[in-house]
């Protein structure tokens, strides 16, 4: 059976749900797909809560771990939606997830207001460069007190302003559960939420004109066809049968040809910046590639090991370190989809860096990473984010 072609006639926007565990991110995602599939059935299918929440580890703990991808359309746009993990233990996925968003829906339970992970996710969204956040105030069916809702709204706006997001962003009152149960009033609230997404999340500025670059997130073997690497295209455009170079992490880069491109299980003739897709690589073995490498136009990008970065070190209250660090500090630097250990050299005259400080530092990585100025990274220790920065200068 020939696979359906992917429709590109509408602007394509990557979106996602972020927020505190149990505030209803996955329920909101399910409600959006259900309500849109009923209103615009020819363009949408409903994804059940369980289908979104489907990774096996999640079931035991009732928390979202893996990132679920769903798609839906409004009359104005096609959305690819990631349901980002909710639990602090899974921040690593949050970083890869949030990095795939042109805008985020921050889900806050009206019954609780902003919680520690709400703050953490907004901070992470800023670190990884999510350009816009709007708010779904969930569980509004459970709160009768208008003053209480107003108070929660004020807290949320303060939180957005703290991290330089638009404090006048739409805050839409919803009940995801009631919408899933078919309550008309709350179904309408989900449509209002999607209108707010259409109106407030700017059309993404795609980096289509730059040379092709896609960070590898995952690798699969398809029997009889070869190796497929998946990720979100960061820059440029790629046609079937184009030559590519796979570089970073390993000592040597390698060249191969892309023999197939898929998105949402549909065949594409080409992939361009912003697409989440899989690339079939000719003659490439699974062990030849790894997460964290990039697939790129040959010769367009070079891996580097030494750079200077401007870094914000999280305070203790933001979940960062409790103690200062010194010269020769060796944390992990999280670029795009992977951690690489690096050695930090502090500027002359700086003895130590305290949690909450901003600092410019020189870093030497133990493995090469394809980078250019402006690339963002997180600094992590044992799986928790302790800092965020961007590359200001490449030294080697």
UniProtKB/Swiss-Prot annotation:
Region (G1): 19-26
Organism: Corynebacterium kroppenstedtii (strain DSM 44385 / JCM 11950 / CIP 105744 / CCUG 35717)
Gene for this chain: tuf
Residues covered by region (G3): 83-86
Protein name: Elongation factor Tu
SUPFAM superfamilies in alphabetical order: EF-Tu/eEF-1alpha/eIF2-gamma C-terminal domain (SSF50465), P-loop containing nucleoside triphosphate hydrolases (SSF52540), Translation proteins (SSF50447)
Record region (G5): 175-177
GO cellular component terms, A-Z: cytosol
Binding site for Mg(2+): 26
Cited HAMAP family: EF_Tu_B (MF_00118_B)
Catalytic activity: GTP + H2O = GDP + phosphate + H(+)
Places the protein is found: Cytoplasm
EC id: 3.6.5.3
Domain spans labelled tr-type G: 10-205
An annotated Gene Ontology molecular function: GTPase activity
Keywords: Cytoplasm, Elongation factor, GTP-binding, Hydrolase, Magnesium, Metal-binding, Nucleotide-binding, Protein biosynthesis
């Amino acid at each position: 059976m020939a696979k359906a072609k992917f429709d590109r006639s509408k602007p394509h926007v990557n979106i996602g749900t972020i927020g505190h565990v149990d505030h209803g991110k996955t329920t909101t995602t399910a409600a959006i797909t259900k309500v849109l599939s009923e209103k615009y059935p020819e363009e949408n299918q409903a994804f059940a809560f369980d289908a979104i929440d489907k990774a096996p580890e999640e079931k035991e703990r009732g928390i979202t771990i893996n990132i679920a991808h769903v798609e839906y359309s409004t009359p104005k746009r096609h959305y690819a939606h990631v349901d980002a993990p909710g639990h602090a233990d899974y921040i690593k996925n949050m970083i890869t997830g949030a990095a795939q968003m042109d805008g985020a829906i921050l889900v806050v339970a009206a019954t609780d207001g902003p919680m520690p992970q709400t703050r953490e996710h907004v901070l992470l969204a800023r670190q990884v460069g999510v350009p816009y956040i709007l708010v779904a105030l969930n569980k509004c069916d459970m709160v009768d007190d208008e003053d209480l809702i107003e108070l929660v709204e004020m807290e949320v706006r303060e939180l957005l302003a703290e991290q330089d997001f638009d404090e006048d962003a739409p805050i839409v009152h919803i009940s995801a559960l009631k919408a899933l149960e078919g309550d008309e009033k709350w179904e309408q609230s989900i449509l209002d939420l999607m209108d707010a997404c259409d109106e407030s999340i700017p059309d993404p500025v795609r980096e289509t004109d730059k040379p092709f670059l896609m960070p590898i997130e995952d690798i699969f073997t398809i029997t009889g066809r070869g190796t497929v690497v998946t990720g979100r295209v960061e820059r440029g455009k790629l046609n079937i049968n184009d030559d590519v170079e796979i570089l970073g992490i390993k000592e040597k880069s390698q060249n191969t040809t892309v023999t197939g491109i898929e998105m949402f299980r549909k065949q594409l003739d080409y992939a361009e910046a912003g697409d989440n897709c899989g690339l079939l690589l000719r003659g490439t073995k699974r062990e030849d590639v790894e997460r964290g490498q990039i697939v790129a136009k040959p010769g367009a990008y070079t891996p580097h090991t030494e750079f200077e970065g401007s870094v914000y070190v999280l305070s203790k209250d933001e979940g960062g370190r409790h103690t200062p660090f010194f010269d020769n500090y060796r944390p992990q630097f999280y670029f795009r989809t992977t951690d690489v250990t690096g050695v930090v050299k502090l500027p002359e005259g700086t003895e130590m860096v305290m949690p909450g400080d901003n600092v410019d530092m020189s870093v030497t990585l133990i493995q090469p990473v394809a980078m250019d100025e402006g690339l963002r990274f997180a600094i992590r220790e044992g799986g928790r984010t302790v800092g965020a920065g961007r590359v200001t200068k490449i030294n080697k």
